[in-house]
């Protein structure tokens, strides 16, 4: 879940730090999110996980988006859900329901096929609701940060940002306002082209994205190349691991700002 706010005229993105004992991306700063529950669509998963991990509630009461007055009881609802009570039923008992439709699809990342542990992650973008402030759950997540997309990229090594977060921040940094980001997301459609990096052989880890010129000729593993070039598939097209940081770089011989 890509949660945004405007602070001092700058767009900032919200990150949470995963617990050091996590089985995947331990100690990394990531976007809030998690696994879907049975019969749960991706949007609902995103709003539920955001509420569980960060306490931000996208919900409605009698068709209206949650007001600040209603948010006052969100802490108690969150505790019930974290204690194991079904999220949708818990909200319903309080006269509320999640509003997943406010989320805008952004991207769909799939772990490279060469990895033993794999995920299919759909990223959505939304603006922080008025009157709410996120707070990490101190269980799965142990810290949090609001940073501009450009700051996130510059601090990628310190924050231990995984490639999907780095690439997403690169794309977000292309836009000056949240409105522009939301418009760009809507232009991508409800089913963005899946991004499954391929591993390139070499003396250091290198991941190729679907628009990289060597994605099909040099990359190993599965993954669907782009048969066309959408506007978002530009700039850096691969990741190289250097000094504990995934550096987002362009095909050799090209120039990039990322």
Task: Tell what function each PLM region has.
Residues 5-10, 202-204:
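Short acidic-glycine loop/turn motifs at beta-strand connectors
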Residues 76-96, 162-187:
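Acidic, glycine-rich loop-and-strand cores that form catalytic or ligand-binding grooves
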Residues 50, 124, 169:
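Terminal peptide-recognition signature
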Residues 66-115:
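Charged mid-protein connector segments
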Residues 90-109, 120-131, 135-159:
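NUDIX/MutT-family hydrolases
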Residues 1-3:
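Short beta-strand scaffold segments in enzyme catalytic cores
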Residues 165, 172-258:
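Core RNA-modification/binding signature centered on pseudouridine synthases
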Residues 10-80, 151-160:
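Conserved Nudix-box catalytic region and its N-terminal flanking loop in Nudix hydrolases
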